[in-house]
Amino acid sequence: MKFIDEARIEVIAGDGGDGSASMRREKFVPFGGPDGGDGGRGGSVYVIADRNINTLIDYRYAKKHMARNGENGRGSDCYGKGGDDITLRMPVGTVINDMDTGELIADLTEHDQKVLVAKGGAGGLGNLHFKSSTNRAPRQKTDGKPGERRMLKLELKVLADVGLLGMPNAGKSTFISSVSNAKPKIADYPFTTLAPNLGVVRVGPGKSFVIADIPGLIEGAAEGAGLGHQFLRHLQRTGLLLHLVDLAPFDERVDPVAEARAIVGELRKYDESLYEKPRWLVLNKLDMVPEDERRARVADFIERFGWTGPVFEISALTGQGCESLVYAIHDYLVEHSDAHRAELAEDLASDVRFRDAPGAGGEPHERDAGAH
């Protein structure tokens, strides 16, 4: 099973051109002196964030990206042409690390954000620069500097407002397809979703939010079981988590409470800050529960789970309860938007060292997650 959110690429900046050791030779100018030009600079490699790109799939196949070398200098004070820069377009939310040093180079959080990832080499100096009062005909010149060469690890973190959390087959894909424009693959078996699906939920004119259908979790995900960390990392930038629970599993031996506790346990083992994020409980598949049993089954689940936060009862298949949930999410996001942006800014300031671009344990007891 492939999870298209990681790629490894090599970026190679261009070498600088060599300087020229040349003498001016013209009729009637017997001692023309040096006229060797400088070499051109090597091309650099930049990355730029593009909100119209959703995956890193292109970089799983195109793994080497090279900028052009600078041209050598020539006589008659001719400077070499600089190598052309290249720009790699990547999704907003991509994190770029140097694989050799572990340095965090960039976290692309804004559309059109531009970051230098490999700097081209400087051009060499021609002998024109070495002329002095004691050396009128210098033969010295310098070679161009090599461009930077790096192995980069690209990692995509979904920049969504809301993340869907739950066991495989909890109905997350059905829910996101019913409330948004996303069209994820849906089937009656676990692990239908192998890559995150993003959907834009439109509440009204100018009112919308992004929801991420993250692949289902299994117990042991924090240690890498199933698709492991690849699931959990996508939830780190969301402002709100929806914990979807299948209230009517096909297998009667499955206990929804035990599954819900397992999910929360994995969340806490992976990242305490992720566990502390605002989280709402969404009880799904009510259409599969007889009407005369619904109230009792919901009450029993909440009591056994020890949940005191917001609860929503829905059927993603029929749409029952989805509209009220969507409006509640939108109202919450509007109310807490400033706090979420501040959290992202603080996170960015703590761990990102941008390079300048020219111009540019156990079974947890639940708490009231909606009070954040």
UniProtKB/Swiss-Prot annotation:
Binding site for GTP: 166-173, 191-195, 213-216, 284-287, 315-317
The protein's role, per its UniProt record: An essential GTPase which binds GTP, GDP and possibly (p)ppGpp with moderate affinity, with high nucleotide exchange rates and a fairly low GTP hydrolysis rate. Plays a role in control of the cell cycle, stress response, ribosome biogenesis and in those bacteria that undergo differentiation, in morphogenesis control.
Compartment list: Cytoplasm
Molecular function terms from GO: GTP binding; GTPase activity; magnesium ion binding
Protein name: GTPase Obg
UniProt organism field: Burkholderia pseudomallei (strain 668)
Alphabetical keyword list: Cytoplasm, GTP-binding, Hydrolase, Magnesium, Metal-binding, Nucleotide-binding
Any one GO CC term of the record: cytoplasm
Taxonomic lineage: Bacteria, Pseudomonadati, Pseudomonadota, Betaproteobacteria, Burkholderiales
Required cofactor names: Mg(2+)
